[in-house]
Amino acid sequence: MQRLLAPARRVLQVKRAMQETSLTPAHLLSAAQQRFSTIPPAPLAKTDTWPKDVGILALEVYFPAQYVDQTDLEKFNNVEAGKYTVGLGQTRMGFCSVQEDINSLCLTVVQRLMERTKLPWDAVGRLEVGTETIIDKSKAVKTVLMELFQDSGNTDIEGIDTTNACYGGTASLFNAANWMESSYWDGRYALVVCGDIAVYPSGNARPTGGAGAVAMLIGPKAPLVLEQGLRGTHMENAYDFYKPNLASEYPLVDGKLSIQCYLRALDRCYAAYRKKIQNQWKQAGNNQPFTLDDVQYMIFHTPFCKMVQKSLARLMFNDFLSSSSDKQNNLYKGLEAFRGLKLEETYTNKDVDKALLKASLDMFNQKTKASLYLSTNNGNMYTSSLYGCLASLLSHHSAQELAGSRIGAFSYGSGLAASFFSFRVSKDASPGSPLEKLVSSVSDLPKRLDSRRRMSPEEFTEIMNQREQFYHKVNFSPPGDTSNLFPGTWYLERVDEMHRRKYARCPV
């Protein structure tokens, strides 16, 4: 029977026992844990070694209950057929009414995760939120989520909001892992929550919106392990996408610059990651170069799906340029003409793009395409986009197919901050294993997406107008019928004259 660590007060008792007795870690663990059905045991107290296999134990995805079809938007906006569905690679776009805001999205996804896993609320020692959807310049989303912990009496929870465009979720994940592998870890689990509402003014950018949230339970002995020492990061100052107008939800976007920044960050993060993993291999006696062949699956931050296909092709181009002439001729047919180019010379080269997309198509279909299911059908979720891709990947493969694989991940946030990192999937795919349970938990993703209501472009536009009208308005209750929300969804019930927000939950 699976077990779970005890409340915080029990942690203190065990630490005292450590000082008074010579109990081994195994004795401490069995004395301090309680039975639990879906999450594997975690070591309780810090020892002289790292907690083993820190990573993602459980994952929950939330998206709004309505969407607009991109083919309908193409007709409504009088653009050529395929501009959104082919040019951007988008099929549907989820969106929120005035009844939902970033607080309600995060309340919903955390509550769902905790209820599904049956995790006691006092078993969480860190909760961090990654978001760029700011409705208060001072009060963090994390503070609103503390309402969920009130009945448990658990207020000893570290972490706060982290913001830098779409990168905040990844920064929160890294912070959770760092906490767990530090002297400050008290033996409890961490929750990482990332969510956003991506909206744009009417025009070319509006079809690249979306909305959603992802919650991840972080702990040791995870089925998706963050590979230690393997992060390649790039940061710089850029004005590719930013939100200086605090009176509006809408960003300012330099589209061409943003694509160049994304690709440049990808190049540099991949180079840094490759250097670190090759150093690890060299220390182990392996002098082989790292390439995409060493990654079984690859997921990306997804502003729109076509960008991801270009990004995988870009990684192949990095491998091509760093390989020997013999390998270039044998493994990368069709790219020989670009052998003498430098990476920075190719960001806007359409001939290079076309050749790379063709050369990498099979690899894209094998490693990445399945990860785009949620993005294709719901749009850009900003901080939760990358982790929605992870959920999509898990939902389209069996535990047996995933077991033992490496999942590469690229996270990007405008402004800019980016990282390339990786997960190592557990080799245990047996029935009832943590990996099998994790995969099963997201297997209903396609069914849930299909259960949403299809709204017309006219209805979508009206709701966008309402969001503009009520943004930062006070003393009002949002219009709309809460029966249209998914069961168990938290929603904004009222904003009073002092901007204080009250939330309620739909019946489960």
UniProtKB/Swiss-Prot annotation:
Enzyme Commission identifier(s): 2.3.3.10
Record's comment on post-translational modification: Acetylation of Lys-427 is observed in liver mitochondria from fasted mice but not from fed mice. Succinylated. Desuccinylated by SIRT5. Succinylation, at least at Lys-83 and Lys-310, inhibits the enzymatic activity.
Annotated effect of mutating residue 310 to E: Abolishes enzymatic activity
Active site: 132 (proton donor/acceptor), 166 (acyl-thioester intermediate), 301 (proton donor/acceptor)
Annotated compartments: Mitochondrion
GO-annotated biological processes: acetyl-CoA metabolic process; adipose tissue development; cellular response to amino acid stimulus; cellular response to fatty acid; cellular response to glucocorticoid stimulus; cellular response to insulin stimulus; cellular response to lipopolysaccharide; cholesterol biosynthetic process
Keywords: Acetylation, Cholesterol biosynthesis, Cholesterol metabolism, Lipid biosynthesis, Lipid metabolism, Mitochondrion, Phosphoprotein, Steroid biosynthesis, Steroid metabolism, Sterol biosynthesis, Sterol metabolism, Transferase, Transit peptide
GO molecular function: hydroxymethylglutaryl-CoA synthase activity; identical protein binding
Family that this chain belongs to: Belongs to the thiolase-like superfamily. HMG-CoA synthase family.
Functional note: Catalyzes the first irreversible step in ketogenesis, condensing acetyl-CoA to acetoacetyl-CoA to form HMG-CoA, which is converted by HMG-CoA reductase (HMGCR) into mevalonate.
Protein name (Swiss-Prot/TrEMBL): Hydroxymethylglutaryl-CoA synthase, mitochondrial
Organism taxonomic ancestry: Eukaryota, Metazoa, Chordata, Craniata, Vertebrata
